[in-house]
Swiss-Prot record:
Quaternary state and interactors: Interacts with the Sec translocase complex via SecD. Specifically interacts with transmembrane segments of nascent integral membrane proteins during membrane integration.
Signal peptide: none
One annotated Gene Ontology cellular component of this protein: plasma membrane
Annotated compartments: Cell inner membrane
Protein name in UniProt: Membrane protein insertase YidC
Keyword Endoplasmic reticulum: no
Bilayer topology annotation: Multi-pass membrane protein
PANTHER family in the record: CYTOCHROME C OXIDASE ASSEMBLY PROTEIN COX18, MITOCHONDRIAL, OXA1
Gene Ontology BP annotations: protein insertion into membrane; protein transport
Main location: membrane
Length: 560
């Protein structure tokens, strides 16, 4: 087997290995366990009490009938829902701009739900103290409010006074998108010092994990000490708790494929933070939380601290905006752009840019593909010339094979010397394929993880570019009244991709070696079955790329 065949097979094996590995067996680098700082016993006991105060709501929550709980209604162009005045909990949130599915009567996406529901999911910001004698607002506190509706135009002010006359004021604002700002103010009208700590938590009873879990992160996530921390639900379930000592916490939260809930603490200090798992009475719950250092409020003094909650869709431009506006490090990494981040995000920007002009992400994919093809034209031309030279050298290569058939080392040496003499790169024919692999996966990632591609329509029967082609040849594209099993869902776009790939091969120089030629003939069929379950937007890209390659090959053949 000559070097040309070896290079081809190596490229094919590499490509297939990466594709299958990416979809099924991607293993993220093991997260290094944070070193815990050594403290005195008193501080350790204090921290233990603080963490207990945070974790307990995750494992033992008192359920009250929702009809008995007073609420502040949330109303903006992006959100609707309410905040419970009992415990000041964000536990009712609906995303108005997104539907559950493409059906006509589909309901809006529900993000947060109260504790007595099947999909309990909520966030809260509050205060704790290491002294039991300090009376603070807790989960049973009923707050008073100066308004009934929270909107971007109208913040709400909440207040509560304890038996010592200490006033607790909370001002909540919401922007037109998905960001809440919570400013807590404590007015110490008592004659005692108050040791106060601010905390925030997000608690979730159920996990909405996509089937292709290995190709994107879902679960606890955050930016701690300017490093991205990602733990799957299984990771936290195995560990029970992942603790981070006093650190710079830009944000922590829980992420789904398209949705994110995140706590963004005040930047005035460092925080201890935790990713927790607990199970009680058969109910599993996950929680992320942070807690601030102790702040002593002297008699007659005031203290204020501001935190934020993000709860909504992971729109790229929106996360970028918040990251810049509030200096939230790595906030855009809540979207899992993957290994090729430096390519994937620019690819998205390019698609989104053209979408702004054409109003269709499918057309935007076609335009971006043309640009990528033009950028790679020189490489493709060099590849063609190299393949031509190798084909012309085949008689000489066969002569060398016959001459040194009993000496493999000398055979390889002579062939490489021939390549060097004729200035031929034996792997040049594989370069266009290898270069396209990062581009391919970048487009795949953009289609799979960005909310902008969710339910984005093309033309005809394509109603969601991020989903597989819904048609199949085995029921004549819907003419026959039955649905084949999923592995037979080979639609029109996968077939078009295979046909254009076959035609592209016909336009390219045919390998001189018969074995190599046979391998290439089967590639369209292999790719037909392999890509049929991929997002149809990716198949549109690949088919269009093949058509452009055919045009390009015609040009090269004519002028070379």
């Amino acid at each position: 087997m000559n070097n040309n065949i070896i290079n081809l097979i190596a490229a094919i094996v590499l490509s297939l290995s990466i594709i299958f590995g990416w979809q099924y067996f991607v293993i993220k680098p093991e997260q290094k366990k944070q070193q815990q700082q050594i403290a005195v016993q008193k501080a350790a006991n204090l921290k233990k009490q603080q963490l207990k105060a945070l974790v307990e709501p995750a494992t033992d929550i008192v359920v009250q009938e929702e009809s008995q709980v007073q609420r502040i209604k949330i109303e903006s162009e992006s959100l609707t829902g309410s905040i419970s005045l009992k415990g000041l909990r964000f536990d009712d949130l609906i995303l108005k701009k997104y539907k559950q599915d493409l059906s006509k009567n589909s309901s809006d996406v529900v993000l947060f739900s109260p504790t007595n529901t099947e999909h309990s999911y909520f966030a809260e910001i509050g205060l704790v103290s290491n002294l039991s004698s300090v009376k603070l607002p807790n989960n049973d506190t009923i707050w008073s409010s100066d308004g009934e509706i929270l909107s971007p135009e109208k913040p709400v002010n909440l207040f509560w006074v304890n038996e010592d006359g200490v006033k607790f004021l909370v001002t909540i604002t919401v922007d037109k998108n998905y960001l809440f700002t919570i400013e807590q103010t404590i007015v110490n009208n008592s004659d005692k010092e108050l040791p106060i700590q601010s905390y925030g938590l997000i608690n979730r009873k159920y996990t909405a994990v996509e089937k292709a879990v290995n190709i994107l992160h879902q679960g606890p996530i955050g930016c701690i000490d300017e490093n991205l921390k990602e733990y799957s639900y299984d990771d936290i379930k195995d560990k029970k708790s992942e603790k981070f000592a006093a650190s710079k916490v830009d944000w922590i939260g829980i992420t789904d494929k398209y949705w994110l809930s995140a706590l963004i603490p005040d930047k005035s200090s460092n925080y201890s933070s935790n990713f927790n798992y607990a199970v009680k009475q058969g109910i599993e719950k996950y929680q992320v939380d942070f807690i601030s250092p102790v702040q002593i409020i002297k008699p007659g003094e005031n203290f204020a601290i501001k935190s934020r909650i993000f709860a909504g869709a992971k729109k790229v431009d929106l996360l970028d905006q918040y990251e810049k506006q509030y200096d939230i490090k790595l906030f855009d990494r809540a979207i899992d752009f993957g290994w090729f981040y430096i390519i994937t995000k620019p690819v998205f920007y390019a698609m989104n840019f053209f979408y702004g002009y054409v109003g269709n992400f499918g057309v935007s994919i076609l335009i971006v593909t043309v640009i990528i093809k033009l950028l790679m034209f020189t490489l493709a031309n060099k590849s063609y010339r190299s393949m031509k030279k190798i084909k012309n050298l085949q008689p000489e290569i066969d002569r060398i094979k016959n001459l040194y058939s009993d000496d493999k080392a000398r055979l390889n040496q002579e062939i490489m010397a021939l390549y060097k003499k004729e200035k031929v790169n034996p792997v040049a024919g594989c370069l266009p394929i290898l270069v396209q692999i990062p581009v391919f996966f970048s487009i795949y990632k953009v289609l799979y993880v960005t909310i902008e591609m969710r339910q984005a329509q093309f033309y005809g029967w394509i109603k969601d570019l991020s989903a597989p082609d819904p048609t199949t040849i085995f029921n004549l594209f819907g003419l026959l009244p039955f649905s084949p099993p999923s592995f037979l869902m080979i639609g029109a776009w996968p077939i078009l991709m295979a046909i254009t790939m076959f035609l592209q091969q016909k336009m390219s120089p045919e390998p001189a070696d018969p074995m190599q030629a046979q391998v290439m003939k089967f590639m369209p069929l292999i790719f037909l079955f392999m890509f049929s379950s991929f997002p149809v937007g990716l198949l549109i890209y690949w088919s269009w790329n093949n058509i452009l390659s055919i045009i390009q090959q015609y040009y090269i053949n004519k002028f070379n």
